């Protein structure tokens, strides 16, 4: 059929062209690919349409032929330089600098958050307290009743996590996000924090300092970076306790009594430089409540025996401390990209808060009241914990690249965070003594680190 058609049209079929293979042996340098000059009119019978009264036309095919066949390497290079559709070259976009001032302000973030996210419901807050207290006493009663060594490890993990949940609710009382009633916040906060041996007002005030100076290389209160000069002056034991797991995860009780390296004072001492004179009565009250709880535990030790007290309260307390240190550390450390710390005029409340990290804890997110949703909490600590997730989703378009999506937990438990905190202990050691925007550097002598960064 094709032969008949070409004869009627006065055309000769094109000579077959064998394409250059993309795999296998390439053509030799002497191989030639010839193309038919299709612009030349071929003599022969004219094409006469049967049903249309059209004038005679030149039916030569006007096809431009390539001068040569590009090599595979050249074609690949061409693909790399173009976007594959319209030949526009890719422009190399500037890398995102997390230390650059953001193109938005706090008012922009606040405006993006729905109004109901700012509403505090004391009844809802109290419902979480009731839930957690019932869980704590229920777990203790079940463990004491069963008194089985197969059960005790499960109890310790669960009860330590519930102690941590109680701490988070007391933490909300300290921020005033529990309710608008300051007296209710103080009473509930004292009951919750004293029960797990935390001085409510002493810790509340130092934690307020942490929020007011978050991301500041010198004035931050919680897990602040060590300047190089101070780092070099630490003795070997102190360095090991600070940077070798699991010791940093047991630091909280020590911090309550002596704060961090380079800082002085105690959360129990009303004359500590942590506090101003008009806060001393609050500190005395909290210290008295803490001492009363300690006395109660000593009395229970005489009643039930020290071993039983250790199993019911002591080990869960240690698990709680590890939760607290793990979470508070990872909210400001351990990201795969280096994040800045600021000094001087480069620091601002917004820029410091944007160095905070959200973390995903799997199904424990609900148990410890979404404390992992931490960026919005740091910028606006008055938002109740039960609105943090919604507020964060609303603010993400404003944050842009300044918000870092947390890695999701592939398992019900956040085991993926263990590797991140260990990696941070091995690399995040000190910052430069000078400069207003600084990043963590690594001492190769610690934890087998291979280099000084």
UniProtKB/Swiss-Prot annotation:
A motif (Histidine box-2) lies at residues 207-211. A motif (Histidine box-3) lies at residues 374-378. Its EC number is 1.14.19.-. Pathway: Lipid metabolism; polyunsaturated fatty acid biosynthesis. Chloroplast omega-3 fatty acid desaturase introduces the third double bond in the biosynthesis of 16:3 and 18:3 fatty acids, important constituents of plant membranes. It is thought to use ferredoxin as an electron donor and to act on fatty acids esterified to galactolipids, sulfolipids and phosphatidylglycerol. The histidine box domains may contain the active site and/or be involved in metal ion binding. This is Omega-3 fatty acid desaturase, chloroplastic.
């Amino acid at each position: 059929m094709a032969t008949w058609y070409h004869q009627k049209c006065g055309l000769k079929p094109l000579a077959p062209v064998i394409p250059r293979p993309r795999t296998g042996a390439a053509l030799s340098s002497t191989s030639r690919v010839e193309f038919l000059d299709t612009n030349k009119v071929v003599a022969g019978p004219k094409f006469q349409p049967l049903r249309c009264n059209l004038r005679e036309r030149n039916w030569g095919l006007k096809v431009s032929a390539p001068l040569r066949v590009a090599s595979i390497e050249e074609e690949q290079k061409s693909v790399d330089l173009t976007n594959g559709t319209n030949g526009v070259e890719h422009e190399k976009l500037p890398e995102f600098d997390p230390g650059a001032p953001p193109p938005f302000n706090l008012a922009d973030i606040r405006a993006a958050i729905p109004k109901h996210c700012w509403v505090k419901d004391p009844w809802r807050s109290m419902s979480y307290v009731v839930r957690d207290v019932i869980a704590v006493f229920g777990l203790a009663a079940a463990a004491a009743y069963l008194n089985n060594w197969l059960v005790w490890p499960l109890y310790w993990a669960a009860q330590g996590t519930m102690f941590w949940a109680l701490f988070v609710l007391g933490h909300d009382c300290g921020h005033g996000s529990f309710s608008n009633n300051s007296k209710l916040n103080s009473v509930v906060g004292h009951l919750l924090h004293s029960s797990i041996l935390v001085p409510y007002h002493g810790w509340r005030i130092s934690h307020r300092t942490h929020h007011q100076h978050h991301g500041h290389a010198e004035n931050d209160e919680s897990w602040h970076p060590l300047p190089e000069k101070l780092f070099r002056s630490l003795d070997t034991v102190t360095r090991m306790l600070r940077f070798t797991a699991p010791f940093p995860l047991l630091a909280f009780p020590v911090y309550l009594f002596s704060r961090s390296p380079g800082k002085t004072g105690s959360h129990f001492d009303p004359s500590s430089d942590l506090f101003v004179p008009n806060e001393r009565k609050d500190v005395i009250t909290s210290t008295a409540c803490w001492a009363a709880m300690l006395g109660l535990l000593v009395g229970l030790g005489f009643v039930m025996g020290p071993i039983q007290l250790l199993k019911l309260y002591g080990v869960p307390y240690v698990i709680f401390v590890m939760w607290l240190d793990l979470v508070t550390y990872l909210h400001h450390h351990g990201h795969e990209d280096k994040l800045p710390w600021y000094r001087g005029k480069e620091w601002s409340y917004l820029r410091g808060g944007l160095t905070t990290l959200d973390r995903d804890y799997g199904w424990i997110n609900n148990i410890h009241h979404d404390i992992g949703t931490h960026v919005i909490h740091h910028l606006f600590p008055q938002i109740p914990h039960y609105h943090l997730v919604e507020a964060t989703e609303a603010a993400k378009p404003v944050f842009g690249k300044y918000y870092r999506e947390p890695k999701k937990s592939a398992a019900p438990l956040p085991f993926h965070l263990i590797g991140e905190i260990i990696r941070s202990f091995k690399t995040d050691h000190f910052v430069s003594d000078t400069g207003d925007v600084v990043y963590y550097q690594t001492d190769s002598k610690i934890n087998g680190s291979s280099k000084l960064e």
